[in-house]
Design a protein with these regions (language model features):
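N-terminal intrinsically disordered, cationic/polar leader segments
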Residues: 16-70, 74-127
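N-terminal mitochondrial targeting presequence
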Residues: 1-18
Length: 127
């Protein structure tokens, strides 16, 4: 296996796929661009801001706590990490899903973002 990252079966509907750094970066760039566009569209409807730069995305909420979600790649382990709702979500690539997935639940990046935005805002959000 390349990069020491092993593909393994999980309890979710998908298994993760090993990849080298170049392939990870390519897939991550595509996923981040799609996520940025979809978050901006959702933000226009639901009243949150999306900022990007330095290889990460931030979702900013206009609440008393100035809550923010941070989405960033973690290249050494070939994962996308999301810090939100006092939790760190770690998503790995799945060829079967054609997306980064949270192994624990089987949610794709877009599905997970929709769920945690819905939890934060208290109304349904689709990403």
């Amino acid at each position: 296996m390349s990069s020491g990252f092993l593909a393994r079966a999980s309890a979710s509907r998908y298994s993760v796929t090993a990849m080298d750094e170049k392939e990870f970066q390519k897939r991550c760039d595509v996923a981040f661009e799609a996520l940025r566009r979809r978050l901006q569209e959702a933000g226009d409807v639901h009243g949150f801001e999306v900022e990007g730069g330095s290889g990460k995305l931030e979702v900013l909420f206009e609440d008393a706590d100035e809550t923010r979600f941070v989405i960033s790649p973690n290249t050494p382990v070939r994962q996308i990490w999301i810090s939100a709702l006092t939790t760190s979500f770690k998503l790995s690539w799945s060829d079967a899903a054609g997306a980064f997935v949270l192994e624990k639940t089987g949610e794709t990046l877009m599905e997970l973002m929709g769920r945690i935005l819905t939890e934060q805002l208290g109304s349904p959000v689709t990403v």
